[in-house]
From Swiss-Prot:
It comes from the Bacteria. The RecF protein is involved in DNA metabolism; it is required for DNA replication and normal SOS inducibility. RecF binds preferentially to single-stranded, linear DNA. It also seems to bind ATP. InterPro entries: DNA-binding_RecF, DNA-binding_RecF_CS, P-loop_NTPase, RecF/RecN/SMC_N, RecF_2. It comes from Actinobacillus pleuropneumoniae serotype 5b (strain L20). This is DNA replication and repair protein RecF. Belongs to the RecF family. SUPFAM superfamilies: P-loop containing nucleoside triphosphate hydrolases. ATP binds at G30, H31, N32, G33, S34, G35, K36, T37.
């Protein structure tokens, strides 16, 4: 679902922008601090209700304003959506889809599936399991309509159980939570396992194309020993969990691990190889969504040039072009875009950003 128009007001240093966008490639050029990454951040915020750079909303609102407003038009064939989000310094958030209030962030996220490739994205590979669970759960959110409610209820029950661990004296008092928690944990973990298994050949095939010198393997770990009953694990671990004050084992500990030639990728790959692998994983997942759901996936790419050799950059640019996806790419200069092997076409758009102002 490509964005055809984007309006930004008071988002970081972007005070007032109105962009007509290409459904193909949108190149955003500007020096460091000009606002080009903020433009990507604004698009990300529209699709997630949060920033990929800061969790403090007041840092995102322009220093002279009391709120920021983002508005976009989404086109898909004969269908069109108008979406908007307003965030105030007070913390209040207003969402609108086609002019109607009462929507949730998940409704916006459903309309705007997007993959983000930034220098910070290496945490997918060298960070903790939290980042890899988020990777899996992104795919599940867009793949299965029932996943989000199961996942949200699971988080709620885990939070309630952890609070109850500080209050109960015996396991009998906790068992009502555990009965429902165990059922949801099994459902969510099975969905994760099924999705991971379906995505695995796509990842391995795409890795073979970009990294033929390496044998990349992936494996899913559900967060407790496979083949064991989670309800029994909760019961057996009650005293330990009560002493620690939180639930130590379960789907909140799940992981999706990547290995190169049998070893953890973070131990054997160079930063350039890790950067390429991260790009490949995002690309494979986005392409899988398109193939399964016949929905377009947006790609937001910041600082693409760093740590990738020219051949790999050209391969990735060509693959993204072939995908038919809407892509947003930042660069410091237009010459840098040429060095990155991005080839402009007549359908592409090039934007120059300078001190929060933009020209096309």
């Amino acid at each position: 679902m490509p964005l055809s128009r984007l309006i930004i007001n008071n988002f970081r240093n972007l005070q007032s922008l109105d962009l007509e966008l290409s459904p193909n490639f949108n190149f955003i050029v500007g020096h460091n601090g000009s606002g080009k990454t903020s433009l990507l951040e604004a698009i990300f915020y529209l699709g997630h209700g949060r920033s990929f750079k800061s969790h403090i909303s007041n840092r995102i609102i322009h220093y002279q304003a009391e709120d920021f407003v983002l508005h976009a038009r989404i086109d898909e064939g004969q269908h069109q959506w108008s979406v908007g989000i307003q965030k105030k310094r007070s913390g209040d958030t207003l969402l609108k889809i086609n002019g109607e209030d009462g929507n949730k962030i998940s409704d916006l996220a459903h309309l705007l599936p997007m993959q983000v490739i930034t220098p910070e994205g290496l945490t997918l590979l060298n960070g903790g399991p939290t980042f890899r669970r988020a990777f899996l759960d992104w795919g599940l959110f867009h793949q299965y309509t029932e996943f989000y409610s199961c996942w949200a209820n699971l988080k709620r029950l885990l939070k309630q159980r952890n609070a109850a661990l500080h209050q109960v004296r015996s396991y009998a008092e906790l068992k009502p939570w555990d009965t429902e928690l165990a059922k949801l944990a099994e459902i969510v973990s099975q969905m994760r396992a099924n999705y991971a298994e379906a995505l695995r050949p796509e990842i391995e095939k795409t890795c073979q194309f970009f990294l033929p010198e390496l044998e990349i393997g992936v494996s899913f770990h559900q967060g407790w020993e496979k083949g064991t009953d989670y309800a029994e694990i909760l019961a057996q671990g009650f005293e330990r969990d009560k002493a620690m004050g939180y639930t130590m084992i379960g789907p909140q500990k799940a992981d999706f691990r990547f290995r190169a030639n049998g070893l953890p990728v973070e131990d054997v790959l160079s930063r350039g190889q890790l950067k390429l692998l991260m790009c490949v994983l995002r690309l494979a997942q986005g392409e899988y969504l398109v193939a399964q759901k016949e929905r377009q996936c947006l790609f937001l790419i910041d600082d693409f040039a760093s740590e990738l050799d020219p051949i790999k950059r050209e391969l990735l640019a060509h693959r993204l072009r072939e995908s038919g996806s809407q892509v947003f790419v930042t660069a410091i200069t237009k010459d840098q875009l040429n060095q990155m092997q991005w080839q402009e076409s007549e359908q592409d758009s090039l934007f120059q950003v300078q001190q929060g102002m933009l020209t096309k």
